[in-house]
Design a protein with these regions (language model features):
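C-terminal substrate/ligand-recognition segments
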Residues: 75-166
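Glycine-centered secondary-structure boundary/capping sites
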Residues: 42, 168-171
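Structured, solvent-exposed acidic/aromatic patches
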Residues: 1-33, 118-135, 148-159, 169-170
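An aromatic- and glycine-enriched ligand-binding surface/loop that stacks and positions planar moieties
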Residues: 1-97
Length: 171
């Protein structure tokens, strides 16, 4: 869902568009049209033998509590989190000598090979769009609205169940 081939797919309701061709070298703001948040979320010292991911700066590490909140067979875990031990077991390297190291990084907005600019400052010009509202968010908001307004608990549960069913690939 977070690769560029899925930008503005049926799951996406609202996205902030970014481009890798902004040719910007200006750290003063987002006027460059590139997504500079991506480089910040990537793991430091990352070397990917499959050349999918590239090194980032290691900001905003994922907590162990978030990692552990996922069931082992939940596909959303793999989409959301890079487990550093699993990554190393597959032949990759990631530095653990960083501030606030947890052993986990954000996968969905991790820098990917080929997603940054060849002009301007690379770190400022990633093309990854930011998914602001997804269809699953709408379903969860509908569920919450029903519960908070005294609506049908059963209908609220149905909306929630649709989210889980879709995430598991059954919808």
């Amino acid at each position: 869902l977070f690769d560029d081939e899925y930008e503005w797919c049926k799951e996406s309701v609202f996205e902030v568009n970014y481009t890798e061709i902004g040719n910007s070298n200006d750290w003063a703001g987002k006027a460059n049209q590139g997504n500079s948040d991506i480089i910040m979320l990537g793991a430091r010292g990352l070397k990917d033998p499959n050349n999918v991911y590239v090194e980032g700066w290691g900001f905003a590490p994922v907590t162990k509590a978030l990692n552990d909140a996922f069931l082992p067979d939940d596909p959303r875990k793999w989409t959301t989190i890079i487990d550093h031990e699993e990554f190393r077991a597959e032949g990759g390297t990631i530095s653990s000598d960083v501030n606030q190291y947890t052993g986990y990084s954000v996968r969905k907005y991790h820098p990917r090979a080929g997603y940054s600019s060849t002009v301007g400052t690379e770190a400022l010009n990633y093309k990854n769009n930011y998914r602001v509202i997804r269809f699953s968010d709408i379903l969860l908001m509908a569920s919450e609205a029903l519960l908070r307004s005294g609506g049908s608990v059963g209908e609220a549960q149905d909306y929630y169940a649709r989210v889980v069913k879709r995430a598991m690939g059954d919808d």
